[in-house]
Design a protein with these regions (language model features):
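Solvent-exposed N-terminal domain segments of exported/luminal and surface proteins
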Residues: 1-79
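Extracellular/lumenal glycan-associated surfaces
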Residues: 39-46, 64-69, 95-108, 153-168
Length: 188
């Protein structure tokens, strides 16, 4: 479960906030207190690039630093467009079984180089800016990845960024659509 405010905590919870990016009637019917938000992800200490990339799938594809799951740009059997109205101010909602982010988690990252979380192939994902340059990286691969230093490293290493492209009509940015550049493990 996330460590920040959201309307998905439900009225009466200390972290509940009134919806600002959606409305109560547009929100998914579930609320966080009814779910066990625990998850585990085992990744190599030093992840490596795979010989070929692989597509992300439905469900959790990573874990954010807030403790909630990261999902790709799909919702059910289609694009996120129709479900975008259910997303809270931080680009997340509940469904089918957990609170998760699809869009840049504005609870702690908004157009910056902050750590977002870890993707299930073991590579970290950061905000839209590069810590090494202080600007939007111009050398990203199709997954939003490149090799440079980060706020947590002194030597250059491969990592992902939220790609600086507005998603559809949301005025926000997808956290990670993929494909994976490493070998993914399951988030359980």
């Amino acid at each position: 479960n996330p460590n920040h405010t959201t309307p998905y905590w439900g009225i009466g919870h200390p972290k509940y906030v009134v919806p600002s990016a959606t409305t109560e009637s547009d929100m998914t019917p579930s609320r966080i207190p009814g779910y066990d938000g625990s998850a585990s992800l085992i990744v190599p200490q030093a992840p490596s690039l795979a010989s070929s990339s692989s597509n992300t799938s439905l469900g959790a594809i990573g874990i954010a630093i807030s403790g909630a799951a990261i999902f790709n740009d799909q919702e059910g059997n289609g694009a996120l467009d129709q479900a975008a109205v259910t997303l809270d101010y931080t680009g997340a909602h509940i469904g089918p079984q957990e609170y998760h982010y699809h869009l840049e988690p504005r609870a702690w990252s908004d157009d910056d180089d902050d750590l977002i979380g870890i993707i299930s192939d073991g590579f970290f994902i950061y905000g839209r800016k590069c810590n090494a340059t202080g600007t939007y990286p111009t050398d990203l691969d199709t997954s939003g990845g490149h090799t440079s230093t980060t706020e947590h490293t002194i030597t250059a290493e491969y990592h992902y960024h939220i790609i600086n492209e507005i998603y559809s009509t949301t005025a926000s940015y997808i956290v990670f659509a993929g494909p994976y550049q490493g070998s993914p493990n399951a988030v359980n």
